[in-house]
Design a protein with these regions (language model features):
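Low-complexity or membrane-interfacial segments used for flexible interactions
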Residues: 1-55, 61-64, 71-78, 84-89, ...
Length: 191
């Protein structure tokens, strides 16, 4: 189990997350990198930032382990997942806009899995492999009234059912961040 917790800020100019294991120990962090002063200013005064490119680094104690890039978007999002050296692992592609949101997990041009929202509210997601078997779940946790009203910080529990092969394992790690940057950051607060 992993808990991905967005850092609480009243005004959020960059995305930052802490990653905890099942026993509550911080095992990593995720930081938004490469954001110019102009993009930060745009994020402060408008919501146009949601349409621009975002770069996130997933880090452990030794340094970056994954790099996620969400290219500029108009309607549907996609997130490119790669190693810190630039080696591509795959991409997470939003398959639909209306109804229960779904993302396809694609590696080397083939479908290796999917992320499926369980309802229109998009708080609970099932992650499946290419055969449609659930391999993990993402659950958005309610932050409490004050945190919800005054910040954009969200928390996600990622429950992986068993050890997964690559690139699916890395795609599952990237999934909660994809849900947050592709869906949740776009629909509230200063984002």
């Amino acid at each position: 189990m992993l808990l991905v917790s967005q850092r609480t800020k009243l005004i959020e100019l960059t995305n930052e997350y802490a990653v905890y294991d099942g026993e509550g120990r911080q095992i990593g962090a995720v930081v938004q990198v490469g954001q110019s002063g102009l993009k930060k200013a745009m994020r402060l005064v408008s919501n146009l930032d949601q349409y621009l490119t975002h770069h996130l680094e997933v880090r452990d104690a030794r340094g970056p382990v994954l790099v996620l890039t969400r290219p500029a978007k108009v309607v549907k999002s996609r997130v490119l997942v790669q190693r810190p050296d630039g080696t591509p692992l795959g991409e997470i592609v939003q398959a639909n806009v209306f109804g229960r949101i779904r993302f396809d997990l694609v590696a080397d041009g083939r479908l290796v899995g999917a992320i499926q929202a369980e309802n229109w509210r998009a708080w609970d997601f099932s992650i499946t492999d290419a055969a449609g078997t659930e391999v993990a779940r993402i659950t958005k946790k309610w932050e409490g009234l004050a945190r919800t009203m005054f910040t954009t910080a969200d928390r996600y529990v990622v429950l992986v059912h068993y050890r997964l092969p690559e690139p699916l394992a890395s795609m599952v790690v990237a999934s909660a961040l994809t849900v947050d940057t592709a869906l949740k950051q776009d629909d509230r607060g200063w984002n």
